[in-house]
Amino acid sequence: MAQLDPKTINKIVLAYSGGLDTSIIARWLQETYDAEVITFTADIGQGEEVEPARAKAEAMGIKHIHIEDLREEFARDYVFPMFRANAIYEGEYLLGTSIARPLIAKRLVEIAKEHNADAISHGATGKGNDQVRFELGAVALSPDVVTIAPWREWDLSSRESLMEYAKEHNIAIDYAGNKKKSPYSMDANLLHISYEGGILEDPYAEAEDDMWRWSVSPEEAPDEAQYLELEYEKGDIVAIDGEALKPYEVMIKLNEIGGKHGIGRLDIVENRYVGMKSRGCYETPAGTIMLKAHRGIESLTLDREAAHLKDELMPRYAKTIYNGYWFSPERMMLQALIDKSQEYVNGTVRVKLYKGAVSVVGRKSDDSLFDEKIATFEDDAGAYDQKDAEGFIRLNGLRLAIEASRGRDLSK
């Protein structure tokens, strides 16, 4: 990773949302480095119009403005591979923010090369995980990349000082109309929307119900359950209720339906990679449905030991993504194993959505390992000889019997 020399910085590619922080960063970079700023705005399904960012950038004299629809690439190449692993961090978090950063880092590096830029920049703070994710992703793809992280350099340490800077530099903040200003720091993409700050900084304070943007409260959800049939090919959803859909379309549809039924709300305290604990609230309707359904189809099609091995490796895989190592040898190795395991994960899962809960109520597959003739409680016509269990138990209990015969008390 190259060291920063301000005198050599002439062009900077900025990950730009058009919001307060990155608008101020754009101006700050222009003034501090006397450099040309090139903006990159990614549409990864945040649910807002990204085009207004163009007008905002133009108003600051920015000539090269990149606005790209990356929803399909994000869903297909990042979210879906992660869900083949059933990845969750610390038992609950579906990695919605973590998985979005590698793609943005990748495009930052690529655009920097296109423009022969000297540096890239982002709006992540010096306290969070995103700075790590952006910069590890960038250096993995371009070892000589120079990254400018203004939050680690400037003296604008509060929202008030940011607002003052914006006023002094004639930076218009609210380009989205008259929407009510949220007291929370929010980040959204196809997989989730996150909320931090405000009253959430007190881990005992319950989030206000009007905070949630994507879902109704389970209490207000419909009184009638909704059923969905999700069709899988090699571990990925390819159709919903018989309608073939692209990965990003799958997520849009499941977010809409799941949100209507109060699916996917989460309130957690997590351990950040940088060392502190952080309280966050998340809405992940599609991801919650996808995780439940994927485990449902795997239960039918995966060999027992393969399934158990996946479960053992999953926490390491999830931590790898959470900590920013998507572009790493270990993630690629784990992904190869995971993808191999999905070869026969084909079929249909039927799920029931009702007042915040997702239940698998049916599953079928031409690649099913479930053998009704063997598993039945009725007459199996000799398919399974129950006498075989006697020897199985005797051999598996042999070591325990030897322990007991030596007078060792295994009850304590």
From Swiss-Prot:
Cellular localization per UniProt = Cytoplasm
Residues the record lists as binding L-aspartate: T125, N129, D130
Q: Which domain of life is it from?
A: Bacteria
Entry EC number(s): 6.3.4.5
* A Pfam short name: Arginosuc_synth
EC main class here is: ligase
Its quaternary organisation is: Homotetramer.
Protein's name in the database: Argininosuccinate synthase
Q: Which organism is it from?
A: Psychrobacter cryohalolentis (strain ATCC BAA-1226 / DSM 17306 / VKM B-2378 / K5)
